[in-house]
């Protein structure tokens, strides 16, 4: 089934001109009550699609003031709602109309849930109308963090809402099927384009070599070869073989690999600012980025962290010229856009929590000096900031040349032309409601949820539960009784009353304070002693089947030992769990990382070295199947 992106036609093509340039030929969708200006003798070159893209960029750049150029270098959040809304208190912000009309900004990250595709498309169309009313009419590029799975944490991702719902990236890695990854990316692209989103702030290709890190669920696991293989399909699914009007551009992150954070703490926070390489293994973490560049990655984002104990200066990667210019651009040959992670210049708030600027290693620099340092490092655009006046000041004071600004602005404008935004930035809002979350897309997501389940243990082949009576009684935790009752089984109040127990648990973590920080699952990977004792009573009372949501590699040897069967899942609903338990679907997943045997083993392993944990309970690649329960290298089956 092929669903065309609203506002664009399948026959849209790139026409080669005699000059060797490429000109864009499209038949635009235009919202009712609005018209795109027609070409005439006075049409500027940059608005004339018969010219090649490089000529159009040159023409536009020559017309821009330094203030208009400065606005292009900023990419910040966009909140759904009135365009003149400025928020209040800790959520105060410049209004959208101010950022577009006064600050000349044209890159925004949609930072709110999408609950109605048509309304979101209409909202983005209104933003494009506002942008076209400015002096030069530069269209807006709207981006998003991942929003096709189960994670809800402003700053890292959103639940699917009206979009089709799939496993997290770590679940696609468990499935190990390049075709499914490509299909996911193509579906997500169609749904993004339908509402007007043209930039994906993903994939996250960090290697999960530090199992305590809070951001593993959006990675592809611990293995660089598997990560590299799958990310190629991911990028090509979003962008196509070449970036164009049918593409959603991707932002590959977090260079040079965000996984080896010291003690597993995340560098959003000052206590997690260090990235360490005790195994001298930086090269391993670069492999996915090399694959991404070869696959056509057009934009790369460095992480917040600062390297310690290496040949590099211990300053955050976006401030680090040897990382951005010498390593990424010169050594790896990347000539695309480098977008910083969010909030490196200005202190601010995320989810109501105060967050100092993540200027690790250069905290003592002024905001102006930080901006200059980032540009000098080789970055093009400031994420999560809305401070064009700093760029204007840098140029006016002779600290940064306007020619240097032009280098980055040229990259950013060219991307807009390649995406076709200058020729038609609008989408068909009514069609968006038909494309987003359509039955076919939803079915594909549900199939992937079920297939990605990983069967870790299956004592006495207890699963699938196929030959049980309708009078069977279940004790459950972690999901609503209505899911079981829809199968016409009975839910009871205690394990002692039940014939089976079905438990769904999140992987263990230590709760943290704060609005944003509280959503980051960090700290210990093991349940505390009180919780272990509570669970043990269930396992001793009734045959128990456990599903652990593996957003991180859980330390659960006691559950493997005591429960009858244990699954790992990576983003799935309760219907998917029950379909796998009752044999409607079969688990096909393989572990995308090692499962450590203890926290002592976790603490002893080197942060930058994959598969460095001592005596893992299960190794990378473990996964049983219903057809052949011992189809793995696990000693449990020997």
Curated annotation (Swiss-Prot):
Keyword Transmembrane: no
GO biological process, one term: cellulose catabolic process
Active-site feature positions: 341
Enzyme Commission number(s) from the entry: 3.2.1.21
Lipid metabolism in keyword set: no
Locations listed in the record: Secreted
Keywords: Carbohydrate metabolism, Cellulose degradation, Glycoprotein, Glycosidase, Hydrolase, Polysaccharide degradation, Secreted, Signal
Pathway(s) per entry: Glycan metabolism; cellulose degradation
UniProt main location, coarse: secreted
Signal sequence coordinates: 1-18
One Gene Ontology CC term in the entry: extracellular region
Reactions performed catalytically: Hydrolysis of terminal, non-reducing beta-D-glucosyl residues with release of beta-D-glucose
Sugar attachment sites: 40, 94, 116, 223, 274, 364, 480, 488, 528
Gene Ontology molecular function terms on file: beta-glucosidase activity
Family to which the UniProt record says this protein belongs: Belongs to the glycosyl hydrolase 3 family.
Role played: Beta-glucosidases are one of a number of cellulolytic enzymes involved in the degradation of cellulosic biomass. Catalyzes the last step releasing glucose from the inhibitory cellobiose.
UniProt protein name: Probable beta-glucosidase C
């Amino acid at each position: 089934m092929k669903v065309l992106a609203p506002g664009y036609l399948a026959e849209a093509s790139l026409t080669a001109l005699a000059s060797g340039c490429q000109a864009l030929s499209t038949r635009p969708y235009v919202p009712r009550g609005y018209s795109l200006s027609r070409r005439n003798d006075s049409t500027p070159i940059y608005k004339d699609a018969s010219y090649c893209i490089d000529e159009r960029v040159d023409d536009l750049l020559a017309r821009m003031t330094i203030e208009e150029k400065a606005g292009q270098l900023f990419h910040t959040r966009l909140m759904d709602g009135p365009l003149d809304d400025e928020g209040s208190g800790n959520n105060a912000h410049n209004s959208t109309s101010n950022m577009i009309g006064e600050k000349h900004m044209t890159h925004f990250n949609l930072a709110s849930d999408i609950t109605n595709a048509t309304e979101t498309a209409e909202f983005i169309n209104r933003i494009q109308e506002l942008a076209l009313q400015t002096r030069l009419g530069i269209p807006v590029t709207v981006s998003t963090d991942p929003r096709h799975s189960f994670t809800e944490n402003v700053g890292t991702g959103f639940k699917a809402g009206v979009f089709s719902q799939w496993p997290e990236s770590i679940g696609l890695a468990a499935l190990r099927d390049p075709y499914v990854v490509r299909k996911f990316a193509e579906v997500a692209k169609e749904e993004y384009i339908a509402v007007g989103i043209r930039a994906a702030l993903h994939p996250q290709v960090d290697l999960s070599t530090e199992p305590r890190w809070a951001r593993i669920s959006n990675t592809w696991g611990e293995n660089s070869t598997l990560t590299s293989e799958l990310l190629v399909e991911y990028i090509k699914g979003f962008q196509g073989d070449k970036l164009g009007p049918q593409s959603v551009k991707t932002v590959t992150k977090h260079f040079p690999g965000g996984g080896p954070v010291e003690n597993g703490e995340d560098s959003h926070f000052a206590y997690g600012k260090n990235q360490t390489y005790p195994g001298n293994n930086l090269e391993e973490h670069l492999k996915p980025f090399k694959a991404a560049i070869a696959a056509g990655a057009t934009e790369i984002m460095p992480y917040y962290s600062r390297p310690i104990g290496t040949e590099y200066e211990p300053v955050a990667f976006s401030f680090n010229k040897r990382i951005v210019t010498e390593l990424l651009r010169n050594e790896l040959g990347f000539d695309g856009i480098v977008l910083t992670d969010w909030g490196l210049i200005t202190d601010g708030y995320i989810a109501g929590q105060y967050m100092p600027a993540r200027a690790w290693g250069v905290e003592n620099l002024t905001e102006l000096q930080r901006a200059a340092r980032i540009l000098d490092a080789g970055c093009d655009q400031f994420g999560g900031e809305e401070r064009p006046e700093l760029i204007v000041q840098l140029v006016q004071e002779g600290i940064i040349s306007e020619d240097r600004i032009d280098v980055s602005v040229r990259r950013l404008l060219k991307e807009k032309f390649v995406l076709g935004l200058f020729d038609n930035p609008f989408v068909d809002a009514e069609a968006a409601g038909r494309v987003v979350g359509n039955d076919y897309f939803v079915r594909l997501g549900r199939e992937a949820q079920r297939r990605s389940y990983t069967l870790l243990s299956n004592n006495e082949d207890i699963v699938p539960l196929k030959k049980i009576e309708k009078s069977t009684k279940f004790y459950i935790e972690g999901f609503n009784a209505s899911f079981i009752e829809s199968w016409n089984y009975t839910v009871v109040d205690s394990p002692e009353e039940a014939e089976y127990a079905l438990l769904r648990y999140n992987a263990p973590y230590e709760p943290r304070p704060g609005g944003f920080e509280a959503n980051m699952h960090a700290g210990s990977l093991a349940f505390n002693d009180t919780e272990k004792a509570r669970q043990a009573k269930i396992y001793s009372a009734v045959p128990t089947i456990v599903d652990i949501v593996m957003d991180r590699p859980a330390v659960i040897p006691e559950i493997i030992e005591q429960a009858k069967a244990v699954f790992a899942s990576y983003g799935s609903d309760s219907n998917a769990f029950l379909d796998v338990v009752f044999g409607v679907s079969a688990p096909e997943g393989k572990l995308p990382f090692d499962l450590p045997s203890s926290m002592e083993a976790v603490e002893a392993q080197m942060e930058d070295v994959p598969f460095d944990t001592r005596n893992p309970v299960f190794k990378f690649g473990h996964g049983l199947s219903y057809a052949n329960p011992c189809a793995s290298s696990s000693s449990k089956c020997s």
